[in-house]
Amino acid sequence: MSNFKVRDPVIQERLDHDYAHHPLVARMNTLDQGNMSQAEYLVQKRHYLVFLIAHHYYEAYLRRMGGIQRRDHLQTLRDQKPRERADRVSAASAYDAGTFTVPSRPGPASGTTPGGQDSLGVSGSSITTLSSGPHSLSPASDILTTLSSTTETAAPAVADARKPPSGKKK
């Protein structure tokens, strides 16, 4: 089991020899020995080196996350959001304007009375229906589409009923 014992790392000595001019080694060598013994000083120097390496990678992380790359990435995301909103608004306005087409399916979407009028008092021919299939909308959407289309055809009649009679005022 003594074979598996972790020995003291020799990173410090390797850095001193291999990378003598590296900025981390220069900062490590500025550590003041003070009144420490040589053994304590080597341990503290090793700990300081670990801190310097961690600090170096943390600064690199901050540069990457807060620097130019991060700002460019965030700006790209911000630029995409208005386009997505504009697409949604244009689709909704196309639907409201009546240019949004929906294929019809056979059979009426709501029951009609014998006089050819549905329960809302609008003729059955003005009701649009949605197609059935694997990609069709839910029955609640069918009802909403039916109601919106009947409202669009009934709206001029309601507006005409609200107009005051055109005549001379006394």
Curated annotation (Swiss-Prot):
Domain of life of the native organism: Viruses
Biological process terms in GO annotation: viral process
Keyword annotations: Capsid protein, Host nucleus, Virion
Biased composition (Low complexity): 144-155
Subcellular location: Virion; Host nucleus
Keyword Hydrolase set for record: no
Annotated region described as Disordered, given as residue ranges: 76-170
Bias-annotated ranges (Basic and acidic residues): 76-88
GO cellular component terms, A-Z: host cell nucleus; viral capsid
Composition skew (Polar residues), residue ranges: 110-139
Record's subunit section: Interacts with the major capsid protein/MCP.
Family: Belongs to the herpesviridae small capsomere-interacting protein family.
Protein task: Participates in the assembly of the infectious particles by decorating the outer surface of the capsid shell and thus forming a layer between the capsid and the tegument. Complexes composed of the major capsid protein and small capsomere-interacting protein/SCP assemble together in the host cytoplasm and are translocated to the nucleus, where they accumulate and participate in capsid assembly.
Name of this protein: Small capsomere-interacting protein
Species: Human herpesvirus 8 type P (isolate GK18)
